[in-house]
Amino acid sequence: MAAATMAISSSSFAGKAVNVPSSSQITGNGKATMRKTVTKAKPVSSGSPWYGPDRVKYLGPFSGEAPSYLTGEFPGDYGWDTAGLSADPETFAKNRELEVIHCRWAMLGALGCVFPELFARNGVKFGEAVWFKAGSQIFSEGGLDYLGNPSLVHAQSILAIWACQVVLMGAVEGYRVAGGPLGEVIDPLYPGGSFDPLGLADDPEAFAELKVKEIKNGRLAMFSMFGFFVQAIVTGKGPLENLADHLADPVNNNAWAFATNFVPGK
């Protein structure tokens, strides 16, 4: 009763009518049910250059204007959708979630590709520091030592690593989507709560700007990871070694030189 009274009083300030459920709707067959409610984020101020109809746009060479369904509501919306991939709202929501998740993985992956090699080049012993060779160490006779230290994690079974990854990532993803004992999730893409111990999302306008920075850096990281994959296939070297080779001899160590000389399988 108190909850219903609070709901009526709070909504009356917004000028909206409230339908108070009857006791039978609340209790059902003698069982109380709880539903996850989703609250809409506070609108970003019109002065932001990244949101709204007057936001920064990149329409590409084949688009005269931004399509009507791209209104600048979401971070990273530059009004460019020549192929119409965002026309269907459900497809757009799914693709947006996939992009944000892949952005986060790519940013972590790019750091994981660069930093071990950077540390190894500065005297830190990692064992195998090149990112696409490190995982294969688990099949060696001595197994895989995390950070080159057998007292941390000494892995010798690929199945055990796979099982740990499934359990740990499954638990985190389940909590991100459905909530858990540490709190209820309002937005699966930006769950906040225990996922935001520093309180970066407390200020709505600062949080909106951080979303834009995340998506921009994430898109750059996805391109970086694609480049790392291509480098690994073509040169068989890590990103920092490729960079050092290019700086030492830019004429013979560049994308054009490798593209014109590369023959798969040789």
Curated annotation (Swiss-Prot):
The modification Phosphothreonine is found at T37. Keywords: Acetylation, Chlorophyll, Chloroplast, Chromophore, Magnesium, Membrane, Metal-binding, Phosphoprotein, Photosynthesis, Photosystem I, Photosystem II, Plastid, Thylakoid, Transit peptide, Transmembrane, Transmembrane helix. It is found in: Plastid, Chloroplast thylakoid membrane. Pfam families: Chloroa_b-bind (PF00504). Chlorophyll a 1 binds at W80, S86, E99, R219. InterPro entries: Chloro_AB-bd_pln, Chloroa_b-bind. Chlorophyll a 5 binds at K213, Q231. This is Chlorophyll a-b binding protein 25, chloroplastic. It comes from Petunia sp. (Petunia).
